[in-house]
Amino acid sequence: VLFAVGGAFALCLPSAAVPMWARRYNVACSTCHNWPAFQLTAVGLDFLRRGHRLKGDGFDKDWTHLVAGHVEWEYDAATGSTNQFNSPEFHLHAGGALTENFSGYLNANVNNEIEAAYLQYTKEWGDDTYFTARGGRLSPTLLRNYGNGLEAGASDPLILSDTTLNANPFTPDRTNNGIDVGGRYQMFFAQVGVLNGDDVAGQASVGHHKDFYATLEATPDGVSGVGLYYHHGGYDLGDPTAPPQLADSYHREGVFANYSQPLFRIAGAYLYGQDHVATVTPDRKIQGWYAQVNGYPSGWVAVWVRYDDTKTTDETGQLRTRQGTVGATFKVFEMNTTSARIALEAGRQEMPGTHTNLGVANLIWAF
């Protein structure tokens, strides 16, 4: 039985859209999102890829068009955790076009860490052809689109954000310090990047492991389409203060697809990977997929359902996780200065010999 618990106020955020861009361009959240869901429209996806800017953008001197914030509380019914209500997170957002070619973006969780921060260069040739390069703390735009950019509730697919293999903490949608280059030509968008790997979760191993990723997307209508993903990285297993450590050379591959219409979106992905660890045989393996359907019966509500199935295999055996999640999201209000929504989300997760009923209350107010 699924038990719905919770509510979420969220902002019109491209993958967490922020009111500063609604103020700057004097547009509704539905310009970039299938509001009240976070699903990106063709305009929103192109806005994200270009560097949080529209074609031909330049600097805007009004500081209210460059800065925004949101406050977030969360309650997890499965664990009974109330820490977020007692100590809310505050996020500072800043960015947009700085010059004819340069733009920037910052998402700083004041309570914890900088979640994203990068400077971006974009050179345009017409409406649907441009080159772009970024440097800073970032993640592939393909993962941002199918992760937060697909959100209708408060959670991301397991294979993108939660499932890890043995002691390697890598998940595809995490952010890392690095650089990447990309470009759009008509319906195609490609991106390649080099990142500092993590030897300790959340701590960049500068000058040691360098991770590499590449993506390729085809979106005939600007948003519906398919995408390919590849990541190769390294990780040192063991205690860095008590060598020797074991080198973990790993790779992940994936295929993504979605079909979007004004009233619904069907999306999914399959990812596979292996970890080759010195002295450990056979190779450790991870695979998983998800399918999600969003529905938009009116301008004030979005409903959705998602199924996740992941499997990890190592020398200790195999672990399979299956999860079903449902939700409904309601618009509370929407203005250029502040926006809010309420989302209800519930799920059931099954692992060998056990199951857990899930419910999350997530409250976000953006201004």
What does each model-identified segment do?
Residues 2-10:
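Bacterial N-terminal signal peptides
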Residues 37-42, 63-67, 71-75, 81-199, ...:
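Outer membrane beta-barrel
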Residues 185, 207, 218-314, 322:
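Detector for outer-membrane/organellar transmembrane beta-barrel domains
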